[in-house]
């Protein structure tokens, strides 16, 4: 039995992937949900630095773009991200990649609402709490999204698609900077409210579409849902052919993983 790179090359020769195939195009569209998790990460991570240049924002909270105020408020995002680390593994390994993307995005939406509603009370504590939730949610979504992309992409395009996925962090960062720069000319509270509420856009897209896309076949297989995993691989990678070399290649990889690591345990999710 040919395995490893030999099996990959054999599949590539005998069953060349069909880039223009409708199934391939639909799969690429499904993978955009994982891409958006990276975009959220870039958007949220770059937002606060831009807001510190907005005098209307600083006046609203009686803050400063230097010193302890800026440091503490900014750090709440990172504190939230670090606090989420013990939950990232269990969330995406035990409940699935889609659940991880959903939970992370839901927390981002809630964090955005908490931050946005400070327009009514100028509460720094509330804003910091929202920043904490944003960091917590981004940490989960930014882990689940790329893993989903890697595991669900057709093997022939995995390297290329994964590379493009990483660039979407910069897409989010650029969009964030553009939103802050574009709104700052308003010279009203809308100049900082607009960029903050825009944090919901990509999170909302992930929430709306994550249940319409296939679950990672690798996650399905190693969690005992083998028939469902084979059906997913057959549809999206084998173009309906259950005996496709691409399907067999990945099943052999999943089996090799199980033989080495055994069944997935709860403690395994932390490492």
Could you say what each language-model-derived stretch is?
Residues 247-260:
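Cytosol/matrix-facing amphipathic helices and coiled-coil assembly/linker segments
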Residues 236-248:
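Short intracellular "coupling" helices and adjacent cytoplasmic loop segments at the cytosolic face
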Residues 1-234, 259-271:
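Transmembrane-helix signature of 12-pass secondary carriers
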